Amino acid sequence: MRGLIWNCRGAGKKGMATCLSALISDHSLDFVGLHKKFSPKCIRRIDPFGLFHWEWIPSAGKSGGILSGVRHDIFYVISCNKGKYILQMVVHDKKIKKDWGLLVVYGSTHEEFKEEFLVELAAMCSNMSVPYIVGGDFNILRNCNEKNKMMNSSRSTDIFNSIINALALREIYTSGGKYIWTNNQAHPTLEKLDRILMSEDWENLFPMVYVRKLVQELSDHNPLLLSSGE
């Protein structure tokens, strides 16, 4: 099983839909979680043969917007729950004959809304009754090593780490480089804003799972490629 999590800023840019379609094909993706604005026309260009079941949360102004898709031949969608910052799908995995959850998140870039996002994150994860992964652009750093410049202490960082510990989630190690986002300046700021977390019982389903950072294309975030290691 393979999946992609990516904040593809500028999804409406020329060539972005073609790029996404190529990523799905080249990496034989079974699920995707994407961020930014999308239109039905864009989705048709990404998935011209209708191989995926798509769900989305519309963008609000210049921010927000989540698109999540799973292949019809691999998964059956049991339920879908849409919050302000999180799109939660519970699927039946036809290959392993188990149910599990895919939560795609897009945390607020504004400090004043980060607690609201974290409350939603804690609530949705706490209510999961099946194994699950939660991934996306959290827009929160976990520690000072996740930024190439000086970082001020943050209440949201403390709350985020507390939630991860309370829920016994584990971050899947990302190979290919430490940082996932850049501001593309002459002396760039580099940060790790994107990540994928898993519950203990999801790791038991896929003990060989790993995540690899792909080359940055048409966005200031790198795509994250998850593989079950099978």
Q: Where are the regions that the model predicts?
A:
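A shared catalytic/ligand-binding motif for oxyanion handling
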Residues: M1-E230
